[in-house]
Every structure is written in C-alpha cells, then in structure tokens.
From Swiss-Prot:
It comes from Brassica oleracea var. italica. This is Non-specific lipid-transfer protein B. PROSITE patterns: PLANT_LTP. Disulfide bonds join 29-76, 39-53, 54-99, 74-113. InterPro entries: Bifun_inhib/LTP/seed_sf, Bifunc_inhib/LTP/seed_store, Plant_nsLTP. SMART domains: AAI. Belongs to the plant LTP family. Pfam families: Tryp_alpha_amyl.
Length: 117
C-alpha cells in the first residue's frame, strides 16, 4: 500500500512538472477561444465586425509562429466552428481577410489541420 502511495505521488509530481512544459509546446484552445470571443456575433448572427474581433485575430496570428502552434490553432478553430450550428461559413472563411490578416489555411468545419505549415 505504501508503495502505491509513493508511486501515485511520483506520477502526480511528474504531471505537475511536465504539464507546463507540454502546454507551452502549442497554443491552447482556451487562448484561441479567448482571442476570438469578440467575433461570435459577427460569425453567428451576421452582426457587425467588432474592432475587438480583429484585434483578437491579429493577436492569435502573432502567437501562432511555429507549425505546431498553427496546427493547434487550426484544430481549435475547427472544433469551435463545429460547435456553432449557426456559424456563417462564408464569414468564418473570410474573417482573416476582413481583419487584414493572412493565415495559411481557410477557417472551416472541414479544414485539414495536418496540412497547415
């Protein structure tokens, strides 16, 4: 029993130490969602394009500098797109351009994020 407790403590300690290292390898979906929260009305209710939305798009683009970060951001965007049944696909695909940002893939529910470089 004591060995099991020690093993559990060791595993927990490794998770605590390695967790932040693994998290820094790519953007989190929380970061992606947080940066794009101001875009929801524009993308789902045909509202106006808020300045805060474009600020978030620009920030996200600036954070996604490596291939793993861009692929992770893409996966988060695809997941978010699939969670909104009222998503305007044309507005989602055109969002980066509307904000003056160039990203290397189209935002859609079916983007193959493994091909993003």
């Amino acid at each position: 029993m004591a060995g099991l407790v020690k093993l559990s403590c060791l595993v927990l300690a490794c998770m605590i130490v390695a967790g932040p290292i693994a998290t820094n390898a790519a953007l989190s979906c929380g970061t992606v969602s947080g940066n794009l929260a101001a875009c929801i009305g524009y993308l789902t209710q045909n509202g106006p394009l808020p300045r805060g939305c474009c600020t978030g798009v620009t920030n996200l683009n600036n954070m996604a500098r490596t291939t793993p970060d861009r692929q992770q951001a893409c996966r988060c965007l695809v997941g978010a797109a699939n969670s909104f049944p009222t998503l305007n696909a044309a507005r989602a695909a055109g969002l980066p351009k509307a904000c003056g940002v160039n990203i290397p893939y189209k935002i859609s529910k079916s983007t193959n994020c493994n091909s993003v470089r």
